[in-house]
């Protein structure tokens, strides 16, 4: 019977699948960490812009509201 798998073949296949899953998980984790760092950098830039422009925004709002 040529189609019958032996226990060793199944075990090797499972082990290969586990190794592939671990590699994919590691790659995904590294990619997620990089994306998280990029998002943090962008949020920091947004905070800086908001802080520098907030004073001007408030002045304009007060002037318009006071007119």
Swiss-Prot record:
* Annotated coiled-coil segments of the chain: 27-55
Cross-link Isoglutamyl lysine isopeptide (Glu-Lys) (interchain with K-? in acceptor proteins): give the residues.
Answer: 67
- Pathway participation: Protein degradation; proteasomal Pup-dependent pathway
Q: Which InterPro entries match?
A: Ubiquitin-like_Pup
Region (ARC ATPase binding) residue spans: 23-61
Per the record, the GO terms for biological process are: modification-dependent protein catabolic process; proteasomal protein catabolic process; protein pupylation
Task: Name the keywords, alphabetized.
Answer: Coiled coil, Isopeptide bond, Ubl conjugation pathway
Spell out the residue ranges making up region: Disordered: 1-26
Q: List the disulfide bonds.
A: none
Q: Which GO terms describe its molecular function?
A: proteasome binding; protein tag activity
Oligomeric and partner information = Strongly interacts with the proteasome-associated ATPase ARC through a hydrophobic interface; the interacting region of Pup lies in its C-terminal half. There is one Pup binding site per ARC hexamer ring.
Q: Which family does it belong to?
A: Belongs to the prokaryotic ubiquitin-like protein family.
Quote the record's domain comment: The N-terminal unstructured half of Pup provides a signal required to initiate unfolding and degradation by the proteasome but is not needed for pupylation, while the C-terminal helical half of Pup interacts with ARC to target proteins to the proteasome.
HAMAP family, per database record: Pup
Q: What does this protein do?
A: Protein modifier that is covalently attached to lysine residues of substrate proteins, thereby targeting them for proteasomal degradation. The tagging system is termed pupylation.
**Name listed for the protein in its UniProt record:** Prokaryotic ubiquitin-like protein Pup
Gene name tied to this protein: pup
């Amino acid at each position: 019977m040529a189609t019958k798998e032996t226990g060793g073949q199944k075990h090797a296949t499972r082990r290969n699948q586990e190794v592939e899953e671990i590699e994919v998980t590691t790659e995904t984790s590294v990619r997620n960490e990089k994306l998280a760092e990029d998002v943090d950098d962008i949020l920091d830039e947004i905070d800086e812009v908001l802080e520098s422009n907030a004073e001007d925004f408030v002045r304009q709002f007060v002037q318009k509201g006071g007119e």
